[in-house]
């Protein structure tokens, strides 16, 4: 089955999204899931797919059913980024399945997995808690130079508008601080 997927598309092939389970199912052991991902990556490379074109989903399990599910995913994501140098994704809301205040748990999980090296997520990007988690994680990881996106998103509109009016009245322009 993997061979047929790796040959689809010819020279303009699409990225390969791989899930880290095999014919035995989803293991609770992060080492086994990492090993499965490694096999998939190596096999895909045999077909000419570069690691930059491979996205691995470590498979997020519900934390309410498996209390180590969050820690397992973060461990796997870190290994995938450091050892295999592949991009990662996950269904972020799977972690909170069956629990109250899912958005809060999902946001905490997403920020922590970004810290572990997650490069993309299947989630609701319009939910305020998720947006806050992603923007905050980008700052903490050094991906938001001078916190510009954060400030732009969360600056009080009245303060920003007042400062702009004052600058126009006095003829001053805002200058970037080196």
Spans of features found by a protein language model:
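Terminal or standalone catalytic/regulatory effector modules within metabolic enzymes
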Residues: 163-178
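Catalytic alpha/beta core domains of metabolic enzymes, predominantly
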Residues: 3-4, 11-165
